[in-house]
């Protein structure tokens, strides 16, 4: 059997000017995904992917770094303006939005898309520290 050579797919530079920045901010981490208007992922980053471990992942600074990394990667594909969808109760919500703006992306709209149950599943029990 012939050995298959490991060929990596070259990253094609797309020219997408508008997109959507999805910020998922939980109590443990912040994930920033930048997609085109159809929902195809262009760039993503998270606090954990940048090397933050444990409780440092949940800080606003980690969210800021994740948003900057995702913004830089998306701007390489020609991204200029984004709509922001924020989901979750975490500490990094505002920090991530500010970082996207500081990185040079123009924010056209900010939406809170946190799912709210109509009395669905029972929530986890209260923490006793």
Curated annotation (Swiss-Prot):
Keywords: Ribonucleoprotein, Ribosomal protein, RNA-binding, rRNA-binding. Located on the platform of the 30S subunit, it bridges several disparate RNA helices of the 16S rRNA. Forms part of the Shine-Dalgarno cleft in the 70S ribosome. GO terms for molecular function: rRNA binding; structural constituent of ribosome. GO terms for cellular component: ribonucleoprotein complex; ribosome. It comes from Geobacillus sp. (strain WCH70). GO terms for biological process: translation. Belongs to the universal ribosomal protein uS11 family. InterPro entries: Ribosomal_uS11, Ribosomal_uS11_bac-type, Ribosomal_uS11_CS, Ribosomal_uS11_sf. This is Small ribosomal subunit protein uS11. Part of the 30S ribosomal subunit. Interacts with proteins S7 and S18. Binds to IF-3.
């Amino acid at each position: 059997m012939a050995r298959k050579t490991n060929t990596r797919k070259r990253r094609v530079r797309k020219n997408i000017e508008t997109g959507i920045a999805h910020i998922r901010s939980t109590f443990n981490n912040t994930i920033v995904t930048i997609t085109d208007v159809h929902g195809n992922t262009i760039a993503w980053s998270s606090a954990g992917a940048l090397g933050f471990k444990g409780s440092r992942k949940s800080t606003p600074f980690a969210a800021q770094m994740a948003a900057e990394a995702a913004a830089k990667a998306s701007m390489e594909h020609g991204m200029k303006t984004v709509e922001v969808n924020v989901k979750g109760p975490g500490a990094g919500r505002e920090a991530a939005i500010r970082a996207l703006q500081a990185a040079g992306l123009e924010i056209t709209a900010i939406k809170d898309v946190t799912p709210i149950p109509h009395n669905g599943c029972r929530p986890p029990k209260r923490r006793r520290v």
